[in-house]
Amino acid sequence: MLGLKKSFCFLIAAAIIFSTVHFISGCAMTYNGEMLFFSEGCSQCHSFKGKGGRMGPDLSAVTNLRSDSWIDRYIINPTDINPLARMPSFNHLSNSKRKAIIAFLKK
């Protein structure tokens, strides 16, 4: 019986640690995405929750309308999706940087 209690306690502790690490890494990714949104120039054209430019569309609800993979493809090469897009390609951004920006947009 004591062995079961130890195993159960271990599983609970592992779950708490895993969820905390996952939460912290998610917060870090969102923070990095916010920094990238402003440092890479996204905010010069796009606004997000009232901050940023007005030339491009407001991105506050973009993750409700488009999938992560669609947003990622659009960041890489907008004219592949919309030949009339005025947004430049951001294909120089690494996969992890694009994911961080998308995580920020989900905030």
Language-model features: where?
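Glycine-centered loop/turn positions within well-structured domains
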Residues: E40-S43, P57, S69, A85
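Axial heme c-ligation environment in periplasmic c-type cytochrome domains
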Residues: G53-V62, I76-K106
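Electrostatic cytochrome c docking/interface patches
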Residues: S19-F38, P57
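The canonical Cys-X-X-Cys-His
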Residues: G33, S39-F48, I71, I101
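Phosphate-coordinating loops and pocket residues in cytosolic domains that bind phosphorylated ligands
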Residues: F38-S39, S47, A61, S89
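Sec-dependent bacterial lipoprotein signal peptides
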Residues: M1-S25
